[in-house]
Structure formats: structure tokens, C-alpha cells
């Protein structure tokens, strides 16, 4: 099983970049859970994956243990970011996703920066884990390294993104 590193980061200074396409992009601070699930599960082959994600998301949202934001372009979801583990003092970001055709345009960075800054302004420590390839993305948004952990990818199971 291959070994890989996950880098744990914490928001040091909020740095939300400007909206990259203000004419056509709109921020949605409470997208419908089914729509978020459709977006996150597109291309997923496991028939139970949609149900599992949706059920967990609905439960966390209902309990105040998660918050998900999205960006829409001409009404359609094109990017999401979420704090999928919320406590009174900490928010763990995960599942930052932008449609592949729109990556590299600053949409995901804008959304993640806004969500992180908002959570921090409400008194939460904002943290996340990412692979080495994503470090520069998060550093530009004001995140700083906290520590690194080693993980094993089990044969036959997909690695975490």
C-alpha cells in the first residue's frame, strides 16, 4: 500500500480573493442538500454513495454540525465548499470542488476564501487537510501549515482527495 502525506493547515489570516466573474457568478450560502449531493457525486459508480453522502449531509446540516456554500453560474452549481465538521470553536473545511471545465479561474479560491473568512469572523478556528499538490492553493487563501501526517492508501480503495 502506498504511503502519502496529508498536510494539516489552519487559517492564519483570511485572504478571500475578489470574485473572478461577478457578472455571472452568484454566491449561495444554503444550497439544497440534494443539489450539493448531485454535484459532489457526479461520475460516482457506487450506487450507495449518493444516499450515504446525502443522508450524512442532511443530518449534519439539521444538527448545525455542517455548513455548505456554493457558487452558481447562470443558475447552475459550479463550485462547492463546506465545513463538514463544525464545533462551537472549530470548523474543518472539506469537499472543495469546482467543475473541471471551470478550474483555474479562481472560482473555488473565491468561494473557499469567503467561507473561511466568514467562519473565522464568527470566532471559529478554520482548519483543513490536503495533499501536497494543493498546498499553494490554500497558502494563497491565508492558510498556514500546522503539521503533516502520513497515511496509507489501502489497495482497492480510492485515496482521499
PLM feature spans:
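Conserved acetyl-CoA-binding loop-helix of GNAT-fold acetyltransferases
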Residues: 94, 98-100, 104-121, 140
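A short beta-loop-alpha structural element at the N-terminal edge
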Residues: 22-38
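Helix-loop element at the rim of GNAT/NAT acetyltransferase active sites that forms part
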Residues: 38-52
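Conserved active-site alpha-helix within GNAT-family acetyltransferase domains
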Residues: 1-2, 109, 132-149
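A conserved beta-strand-loop-helix scaffold within acyl/acetyltransferase catalytic domains
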Residues: 49-97
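Acyl-donor-binding surface of acyltransferase catalytic domains
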Residues: 1-24, 149-157
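Acyl-donor (CoA/ACP) binding surface of acyl/acetyltransferases
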Residues: 76-90, 123, 144-161
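Conserved GNAT acetyl-CoA-binding A-motif
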Residues: 119-131
